[in-house]
């Protein structure tokens, strides 16, 4: 689980910072579109802040991977990755959006979801610890 938390921390922190700093570039690479409305720019930056927060949470939990809190974080990451795959697939298939990073992002989120499942399954087999 520690490796999953470190990899997720690195990826989500980098993408979060990119969305905060250059959201139009990220969206162009991901979806092949632009952020035409100011509201879309705000939503992209809020998304960047959320991803940065996820990255920080994963980084801080990396040394406490046997705790219930870490298991809860990985469960939330599983939900996020499955939702990301679903939304990105809809963007491609339903909305005909395409950027150079779209399918790599789908595959990355799918792989991270499988990794989350594996970690949660393994965690189930071993006892969890509680802080305090």
Regions found by a protein language model. Give the residues of each.
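Non-cytosolic membrane-interface motifs at loop->transmembrane helix junctions
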Residues: 33-41, 72-73, 96-107
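Cytosolic juxtamembrane helix and N-cap/initiation of the first transmembrane helix
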Residues: 1-12
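Juxtamembrane helix-break-helix junctions at the cytosolic face
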Residues: 58-71, 92-94
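Membrane-helix boundary elements
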Residues: 3, 15-42
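Core segments of alpha-helical transmembrane spans in multipass integral membrane proteins
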Residues: 14-19, 39-62, 75-86
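Membrane-embedded alpha-helical segments of multi-pass transporters/permeases
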Residues: 20, 59, 89, 114-120
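Membrane-water interface at the C-terminal end of transmembrane alpha helices
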Residues: 111-132
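Membrane-helix boundary connector in multi-pass membrane proteins
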Residues: 86-104, 120-121
């Amino acid at each position: 689980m520690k490796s999953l938390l470190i990899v997720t921390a690195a990826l989500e922190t980098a993408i979060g910072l990119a969305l905060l700093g250059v959201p139009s570039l990220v969206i162009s690479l991901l979806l092949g579109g632009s952020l035409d409305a100011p509201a879309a720019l705000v939503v992209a930056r809020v998304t960047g802040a959320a991803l940065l927060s996820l990255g920080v949470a994963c980084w801080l939990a990396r040394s406490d991977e046997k705790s219930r809190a870490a298991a809860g974080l990985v469960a939330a990451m599983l939900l996020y990755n499955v939702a990301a795959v679903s939304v990105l697939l809809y963007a491609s298939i339903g909305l005909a959006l395409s950027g150079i990073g779209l399918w790599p992002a789908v595959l990355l989120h799918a792989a991270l979801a499988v990794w989350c499942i594996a970690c949660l399954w393994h965690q189930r087999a071993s006892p969890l610890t509680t802080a305090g």
